[in-house]
Amino acid sequence: MLFRSRVEKVSELLETLPYGGVEQNNFVNGMFEIRTLLAPEELLQELHRIEQMEGRERKIHWGPRTLDLDIIFYDDLIYSSEDLVIPHVDMENRYFVLKPLSELTPNFRHPITHKTVAQMLAELPVDLTEGSEA
C-alpha cells in the first residue's frame, strides 16, 4: 500500500520485450495515476519500499528486476536531484511508457517539451514502436 496516497486511474497492462539490454522474461508495463501528500523524494522512497517488499534487489543498474516503479510526472514539476529526475529521463522515447500513459492522460503536457502525451506517442519513430510489444 502506498502511504498517504490514493490511486486515481490504472492503465491496461502492456507486455513488451525487455528494455536496456536486460536478459530476462518479457516486461509487463502499466501506469497508474495517484493523488499524494508525499513530496517527490518521499514518494520515491515509498515506491522503493514497495519494490523491496515484492523482492526487488538493486544490484546491477539495468539489471533483471521483478518490479520497477518510476515517477514519470509529478503534476507539472521540473525537478532534479542525485536520486530523482522529473519528468522521467527519456520517457518521451519509450513506447512502453507512452502507450499506457496515453490511456490515462493523453492531453497532459510535458512541462519541458510542452507536447501532449498523445503527441509524443504519435511522434515516436517506427523503430521505437516496432518489436516493442511481445
Language-model features, listed with the residues they occupy:
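Short, small-residue-biased leader/transition segments that mark boundaries at the very start
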Residues: 1-2
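A short, local hydrophobic-aromatic micro-motif
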Residues: 6-11, 99
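Short, charge-patterned binding micro-sites
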Residues: 9-35
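Flexible, gly/pro- and Lys/Arg-enriched active-site loops
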Residues: 18-27, 41-134
